[in-house]
């Protein structure tokens, strides 16, 4: 344990302030966190409709498409189709409204096809199982890890996840239990 910690400190000192984890694409965030580190549990919280999903999709896009990392997104609020459409818009730089209406220029189609190729070649997995439990999530993550590799897991969003079913006293306690379970989520190496 001590030698492992010293080894990580030595590697960090040799990197001279560069990102030691998986970069997010947000320079200031990467500077503060040095990227997302293995086994980190990072919770993105804000009031409703503040852009949490858009923010984590930007991170997922950067990690999966620019850094070729294996990313699993578990979406309990939006469908897989909705997320893919948002990713199409992000990656192709085509306005989301144009994608929804189909009112696109020829140059938009070219960018969309190029973006679709990037998305299709990535190691991105989107799972939109409603009300998934922590045990189901753990099982799926292990399966994905064995089949594709897995560098990061994104869950959107925590409050819609079902607990262990042990009949906790309150929803607040159930959410707390789910959060603790995330910190113990381990994947085979």
Where are these regions (language model features)?
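Conserved small/polar residues in nucleotide/adenosyl-binding loops
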Residues: 182-189
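Cytosolic-facing regulatory segments adjacent to core modules
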Residues: 31, 62-149, 163
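Pre-Walker A segment
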Residues: 1-38
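Short hydrophobic/aromatic beta-strand immediately N-terminal to the Walker A/P-loop
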Residues: 42-43
């Amino acid at each position: 344990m001590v030698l492992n910690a010293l080894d990580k400190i030595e590697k960090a000192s040799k990197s001279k302030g560069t990102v030691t984890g998986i970069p997010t694409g947000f320079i200031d965030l990467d500077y503060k966190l040095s990227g997302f580190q293995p086994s980190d549990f990072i919770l993105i919280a804000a009031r409703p409709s503040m852009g949490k999903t858009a923010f984590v999709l930007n991170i997922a896009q950067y990690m999966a498409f620019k850094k070729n990392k294996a990313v699993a997104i578990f979406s309990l609020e939006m469908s897989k189709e909705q997320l893919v459409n948002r990713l199409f818009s992000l990656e192709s730089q085509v306005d989301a409204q144009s994608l929804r209406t189909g009112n696109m220029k020829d140059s938009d189609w070219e960018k969309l096809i190029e973006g679709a190729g990037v998305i299709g070649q990535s190691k991105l997995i989107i799972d939109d199982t409603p009300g998934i439990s922590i045990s189901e999530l753990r099982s799926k993550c292990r399966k994905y890890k064995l089949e594709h590799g897995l560098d990061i897991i994104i869950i959107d969003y925590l409050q819609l996840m079902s607990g262990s079913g042990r009949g906790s006293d309150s929803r607040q306690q159930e959410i707390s239990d789910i959060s603790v379970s995330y910190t113990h989520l381990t994947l085979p190496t």
